[in-house]
Protein backbone atom coordinates (compact mmCIF):
# COMPACT_ATOMS: atom_id res chain seq x y z
CA UNK A 1 0.00 0.00 0.00
CA UNK A 2 1.26 3.45 -0.80
CA UNK A 3 1.08 6.65 1.24
CA UNK A 4 2.07 10.23 0.47
CA UNK A 5 2.45 12.65 3.33
CA UNK A 6 3.87 15.88 4.58
CA UNK A 7 5.11 16.92 8.00
CA UNK A 8 5.49 20.45 9.28
CA UNK A 9 5.31 22.81 12.21
CA UNK A 10 2.58 24.98 10.63
CA UNK A 11 3.06 27.66 13.29
CA UNK A 12 0.56 28.98 12.46
CA UNK A 13 -1.09 27.35 9.46
CA UNK A 14 -1.20 29.88 6.58
CA UNK A 15 -2.51 30.27 3.06
CA UNK A 16 0.99 29.34 1.90
CA UNK A 17 0.68 25.89 3.46
CA UNK A 18 -2.32 25.18 1.22
CA UNK A 19 0.06 24.90 -1.74
CA UNK A 20 1.91 22.09 0.03
CA UNK A 21 -1.36 20.35 0.91
CA UNK A 22 -2.51 20.52 -2.72
CA UNK A 23 0.82 19.07 -3.87
CA UNK A 24 0.52 16.13 -1.46
CA UNK A 25 -2.97 15.38 -2.74
CA UNK A 26 -1.88 15.65 -6.39
CA UNK A 27 1.24 13.53 -5.85
CA UNK A 28 -0.80 10.87 -4.06
CA UNK A 29 -2.87 9.98 -7.09
CA UNK A 30 -4.49 6.68 -6.06
CA UNK A 31 -2.38 6.44 -2.88
CA UNK A 32 -3.59 7.43 0.56
CA UNK A 33 -2.30 10.75 1.87
CA UNK A 34 -1.96 12.62 5.15
CA UNK A 35 -0.68 15.94 6.47
CA UNK A 36 1.10 15.50 9.81
CA UNK A 37 1.19 18.50 12.13
CA UNK A 38 4.17 18.52 14.46
CA UNK A 39 3.70 18.28 18.21
CA UNK A 40 6.22 21.05 18.87
CA UNK A 41 5.14 23.78 21.28
CA UNK A 42 7.34 26.17 23.22
CA UNK A 43 7.49 29.67 24.66
CA UNK A 44 10.60 30.65 22.66
CA UNK A 45 8.57 32.02 19.78
CA UNK A 46 8.91 29.30 17.14
CA UNK A 47 6.01 27.08 18.17
CA UNK A 48 3.39 29.10 20.06
CA UNK A 49 0.27 27.09 19.18
CA UNK A 50 -0.55 24.01 21.21
CA UNK A 51 -0.81 20.95 18.90
CA UNK A 52 -4.52 20.45 19.61
CA UNK A 53 -5.33 24.09 18.87
CA UNK A 54 -3.19 24.02 15.74
CA UNK A 55 -5.13 20.97 14.52
CA UNK A 56 -8.41 22.70 15.38
CA UNK A 57 -7.49 25.77 13.35
CA UNK A 58 -6.03 23.78 10.45
CA UNK A 59 -9.30 21.86 10.07
CA UNK A 60 -11.34 25.08 10.13
CA UNK A 61 -8.99 26.86 7.73
CA UNK A 62 -8.72 24.00 5.25
CA UNK A 63 -11.99 22.04 5.40
CA UNK A 64 -11.22 20.22 2.13
CA UNK A 65 -8.14 18.69 3.75
CA UNK A 66 -9.56 18.22 7.28
CA UNK A 67 -9.89 14.42 7.16
CA UNK A 68 -6.27 14.14 6.03
CA UNK A 69 -4.74 16.05 8.97
CA UNK A 70 -3.02 13.95 11.60
CA UNK A 71 -1.46 14.94 14.87
CA UNK A 72 0.38 12.37 16.92
CA UNK A 73 3.90 11.20 16.09
CA UNK A 74 6.52 13.76 17.07
CA UNK A 75 8.92 13.31 14.16
CA UNK A 76 9.28 11.71 10.70
CA UNK A 77 10.64 8.45 12.15
CA UNK A 78 7.58 8.17 14.39
CA UNK A 79 5.35 8.91 11.41
CA UNK A 80 6.96 6.15 9.35
CA UNK A 81 6.67 3.67 12.23
CA UNK A 82 2.97 4.50 12.51
CA UNK A 83 2.43 4.17 8.77
CA UNK A 84 4.25 0.83 8.66
CA UNK A 85 2.03 -0.45 11.48
CA UNK A 86 -0.98 0.49 9.33
CA UNK A 87 0.29 -1.69 6.48
CA UNK A 88 1.97 0.86 4.22
CA UNK A 89 5.15 -0.25 2.43
CA UNK A 90 5.62 2.61 -0.06
CA UNK A 91 6.02 6.07 1.49
CA UNK A 92 6.86 9.48 0.11
CA UNK A 93 7.29 12.73 2.04
CA UNK A 94 6.19 15.76 0.00
CA UNK A 95 7.87 18.85 1.44
CA UNK A 96 8.74 22.40 0.44
CA UNK A 97 11.70 22.71 -1.92
CA UNK A 98 13.75 24.24 0.89
CA UNK A 99 13.22 21.13 3.06
CA UNK A 100 14.02 18.28 0.62
CA UNK A 101 17.73 18.05 1.45
CA UNK A 102 17.12 18.42 5.17
CA UNK A 103 14.67 15.48 5.12
CA UNK A 104 16.94 13.00 3.32
CA UNK A 105 18.27 11.76 6.66
CA UNK A 106 15.06 9.81 7.25
CA UNK A 107 16.06 7.27 4.57
CA UNK A 108 18.99 5.98 6.63
CA UNK A 109 16.52 4.55 9.16
CA UNK A 110 14.79 2.40 6.54
CA UNK A 111 15.70 -1.18 7.37
CA UNK A 112 16.50 -0.24 10.98
CA UNK A 113 13.55 1.47 12.66
CA UNK A 114 11.00 0.70 9.95
CA UNK A 115 10.85 -1.20 6.67
CA UNK A 116 9.54 0.29 3.44
CA UNK A 117 9.88 -1.24 0.01
CA UNK A 118 10.06 2.32 -1.32
CA UNK A 119 10.83 5.51 0.61
CA UNK A 120 11.47 8.93 -0.90
CA UNK A 121 11.41 12.65 -0.16
CA UNK A 122 10.29 14.98 -2.96
CA UNK A 123 9.56 18.66 -3.41
CA UNK A 124 6.04 20.02 -3.46
CA UNK A 125 7.37 22.62 -5.90
CA UNK A 126 9.34 25.82 -5.79
CA UNK A 127 7.88 28.87 -4.16
CA UNK A 128 6.46 31.23 -6.75
CA UNK A 129 8.08 34.62 -6.14
CA UNK A 130 5.25 36.25 -8.07
CA UNK A 131 2.50 34.29 -6.36
CA UNK A 132 0.11 35.50 -3.69
CA UNK A 133 1.57 33.28 -0.97
CA UNK A 134 5.31 33.94 -1.47
CA UNK A 135 5.53 36.63 1.21
CA UNK A 136 3.63 34.55 3.76
CA UNK A 137 5.68 32.73 6.37
CA UNK A 138 5.05 31.47 9.87
CA UNK A 139 7.73 33.83 11.17
CA UNK A 140 6.07 36.86 9.57
CA UNK A 141 2.72 35.74 10.94
CA UNK A 142 4.10 35.39 14.47
CA UNK A 143 5.72 38.83 14.18
CA UNK A 144 2.41 40.32 13.06
CA UNK A 145 0.69 38.70 16.04
CA UNK A 146 3.24 40.10 18.50
CA UNK A 147 2.92 43.56 16.89
CA UNK A 148 -0.88 43.24 17.20
CA UNK A 149 -1.07 43.88 13.45
CA UNK A 150 -4.35 42.18 12.63
CA UNK A 151 -4.45 43.38 9.01
CA UNK A 152 -1.10 41.78 8.17
CA UNK A 153 -1.96 38.65 10.14
CA UNK A 154 -5.32 38.35 8.35
CA UNK A 155 -3.65 38.37 4.92
CA UNK A 156 -1.95 35.07 5.73
CA UNK A 157 -5.11 33.30 6.87
CA UNK A 158 -7.61 31.71 4.46
CA UNK A 159 -11.03 33.36 4.24
CA UNK A 160 -12.55 30.08 5.46
CA UNK A 161 -11.53 31.20 8.97
CA UNK A 162 -13.72 34.15 9.95
CA UNK A 163 -12.33 37.33 11.51
CA UNK A 164 -13.44 36.36 15.02
CA UNK A 165 -11.60 33.01 14.90
CA UNK A 166 -8.60 34.63 13.18
CA UNK A 167 -8.36 37.16 16.01
CA UNK A 168 -8.73 34.37 18.59
CA UNK A 169 -5.85 32.44 17.00
CA UNK A 170 -3.75 35.60 16.92
CA UNK A 171 -4.45 36.14 20.63
CA UNK A 172 -3.47 32.54 21.42
CA UNK A 173 -0.20 33.06 19.57
CA UNK A 174 0.39 36.35 21.41
CA UNK A 175 -0.15 34.70 24.80
CA UNK A 176 2.52 32.07 24.06
CA UNK A 177 5.17 34.37 22.61
CA UNK A 178 8.14 35.86 24.48
CA UNK A 179 7.73 39.55 25.25
CA UNK A 180 10.82 40.56 23.26
CA UNK A 181 10.20 38.41 20.15
CA UNK A 182 11.49 40.02 16.96
Predicted regions and their residues:
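Nucleotidyltransferase catalytic core that binds NTPs
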Residues: 4-182
Amino acid sequence: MCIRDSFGRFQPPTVGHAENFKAVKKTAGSCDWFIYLSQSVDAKGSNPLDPDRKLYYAKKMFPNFAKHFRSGPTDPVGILKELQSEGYDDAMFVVGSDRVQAMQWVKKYNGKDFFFRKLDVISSGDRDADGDTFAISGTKMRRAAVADDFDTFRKGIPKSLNDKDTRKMMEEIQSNMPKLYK
